[in-house]
Amino acid sequence: MSCGIANAIRWDVSLLIHRSMSSSMSSVQPTSPVSDSPSLGEMHASVAVSRRGHWGFRLLAFLGPGYMVSVGYMDPGNWATGLAGGSRFGYMLLSVILLSNVMAIVLQALAARLGIASDMDLAQACRARYSRGTTLALWVVCELAIIACDLAEVIGTAIALNLLLGVPIIWGVVITAVDVVLVLLLMHRGFRALEAFVIALLLVIFGCFVVQIVLAAPPLQEVLGGFVPRWQVVADPQALYLAIGIVGATVMPHNLYLHSSIVQTRAYPRTPVGRRSALRWAVADSTLALMLALFINASILILAAAVFHAQHHFDVEEIEQAYQLLAPVLGVGVAATLFATALLASGINSTVTATLAGQIVMEGFLRLRLRPWLRRVLTRGLAIVPVIVVVALYGEQGTGRLLLLSQVILSMQLPFAVIPLLRCVADRKVMGALVAPRWLMVVAWLIAGVIVVLNVKLLGDYAVHLMVGVSD
């Protein structure tokens, strides 16, 4: 980013907070119609893109949005489902992680296509396409997904602080409320600073898991066999529950809104040729980033299978339990510390992207702009309350089940983001020359069908479970 562009988009954080707090009513600012305002207006087209030179430099200019999106694919919610799946079923659910990642690559590519082709994010496109009632319903569902995601971040960060520093869970939850300062400072530095911060923490997570996998030394043949799909995943209700949780933890609803917006931060030529070139680079960016997410998610499950399942610890659902077992089983104390460090980095990273997603969703659906600090406080406040209630009623051991439940909730909300996305990218009036080809739409609708069928199956199992419970 050139110095002129960077200076043009910098925020005065102190002035922002002063103006926002001067009047609670003035914090809510109606904007001009969304169709007239670019998504994330202050960061729109703020990152310079070289139009010439070596392809590597052009790729570097586009690298970033995909890695910010990938954060949602390796947040603390993935840890809970991966640990539970690996400890209970060994390597069997690796096939679900692989399938989920392929689904994510396709859906994120479509989200990037929508943003680049239409100059709208998914929330803006939904608002332009649907009635007011439908738009409001989609907004509510998306906000619930963001809160469920934030719930996982709160729990994960609080647990990491407890494991590393001995901070009680309930105080760790309270500490997470002040992360708004971090978000504001990063936004003040510009979009490239946000991306650099996120990528740095991703590298920390990656490094931690490389060391842990080397220490665990899982059998390669069994690991590779786990990537082959098995019918037992669908036939076993417990395996299906965890599989749906993995899908929910991997393919995040709000990531589709986020990606369709932040790809527009690049200052590519808004011409047919410029858009097509930008789409190629954006898809390369997101695919590379999601392959990193695949490695990390698979590593969590492989670690659980190699360390816990192999030692007959079949019910490791709590992250704290995994931390306590890692050092004795592996015989290396640093493994547990690396595990907790990666968890903390994951929770902090997710904070940044969840804040951006919340801002995009509210502005796109409602034409309503909140100050970033207020938006963050509202979302985090709604996520903190259920965690505090669960800790107060059931103790710290209840957070693990709450974490798993949050991922299943996310999966249940996926159709409400995926189906509008598919309808938009198939509309030539919206997409122009970049309308999604028929073969891609067939693949995308198959993915949507899998998501819907899995959720219907889960609801059916829940209904049967409830009826059996009542009859008993």
Curated annotation (Swiss-Prot):
InterPro entries assigned: NRAMP_fam
Origin superkingdom: Bacteria
Protein's GO biological process: iron ion transmembrane transport
Entry keyword set: Cell inner membrane, Cell membrane, Ion transport, Membrane, Symport, Transmembrane, Transmembrane helix, Transport
Keyword check for Cell inner membrane: yes
Subcellular location: Cell inner membrane
Transmembrane segments: 59-79, 92-112, 136-156, 167-187, 196-216, 233-253, 288-308, 325-345, 377-397, 402-422, 439-459
Membrane topology: Multi-pass membrane protein
Major subcellular site: membrane
GO MF annotations, alphabetized: cadmium ion transmembrane transporter activity; manganese ion transmembrane transporter activity; metal ion binding; symporter activity
Pfam families to which the protein is assigned, alphabetical: Nramp
GO CC entries: plasma membrane
General function of this protein: H(+)-stimulated, divalent metal cation uptake system.
Homology family: Belongs to the NRAMP family.
Name of this chain's protein: Divalent metal cation transporter MntH
Naturally occurring in which organism (per UniProt): Xylella fastidiosa (strain 9a5c)
Taxonomic path: Bacteria, Pseudomonadati, Pseudomonadota, Gammaproteobacteria, Lysobacterales
Name of encoding gene: mntH
